[in-house]
């Protein structure tokens, strides 16, 4: 399972504070995220600006990969709220196969590719502030363990019509 998180409102927030405060704030948030990744034995893939990417089930199999990223996401949401009430978090999650590997000649990077990665990214992009937006494959894995609200069918760029869900909490 792959998770993308975007600190919503960070761009407008950062236009009103000094660069030093921006770096400190982002470092505080990402440090908490790093600790949560360790707590859940997940894999931090990368950060890009105010975006954070996580996976579970790679490089080592984890039959609870979907639950792992969902529980992590719930704690990430609470963490951002506790650190800065002016910021929100949009999270997208999808589950399925990925290709993983190390690329590069100088700055090596472990990265992921594939449809699951693209769908998780789209779930974040089409999500809402303070919401965890999940794809149907993830929903099918965890539907008996969490509460959801139905997002209904949405048109997802590059994918067409998709049924998606907003995760509320653990049952």
Go through each PLM region and give its residues.
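Catalytic core regions of nucleotide second-messenger enzymes
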Residues: 40-41, 45-48, 78-92, 153-156
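Catalytic NTP-binding/metal-coordinating core of nucleotidyl cyclase/transferase enzymes
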Residues: 1-71
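ATP phosphate-binding glycine-rich loop and adjacent ATP-lid/helix-beta elements
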Residues: 123
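Short, surface-exposed loop/helix-turn segments at secondary-structure junctions
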Residues: 103-114
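Key residue(s) within conserved catalytic/signature motifs
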Residues: 118
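A short glycine-enriched loop-to-beta-strand structural element that forms part of the catalytic core
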Residues: 55-57, 86-101
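Cytosolic regulatory/linker segments at or just downstream of nucleotide-handling modules
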Residues: 98-100, 126-171
């Amino acid at each position: 399972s792959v998770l993308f998180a975007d600190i919503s409102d960070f761009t407008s927030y950062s236009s009103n504070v000094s660069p030093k405060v921006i770096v400190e704030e982002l470092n505080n948030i990402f440090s908490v995220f790093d600790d949560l990744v360790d707590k859940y034995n997940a894999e931090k893939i990368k950060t890009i600006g105010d975006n954070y990417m996580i996976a579970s089930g790679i490089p080592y199999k984890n039959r609870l990969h979907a639950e792992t990223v969902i529980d992590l996401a719930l704690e990430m949401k609470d963490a951002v709220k506790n650190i800065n009430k002016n910021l929100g978090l949009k999270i997208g999650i999808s589950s399925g196969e990925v290709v993983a590997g190390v690329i590069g000649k100088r700055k090596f990077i472990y990265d992921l590719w594939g449809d699951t990665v693209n769908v998780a990214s789209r779930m974040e992009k089409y999500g809402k502030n303070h919401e965890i937006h999940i794809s149907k494959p993830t929903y099918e894995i965890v539907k008996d363990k969490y509460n959801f609200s139905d997002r209904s069918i949405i048109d997802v760029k590059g994918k067409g019509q998709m049924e998606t869900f907003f995760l509320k909490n653990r049952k």
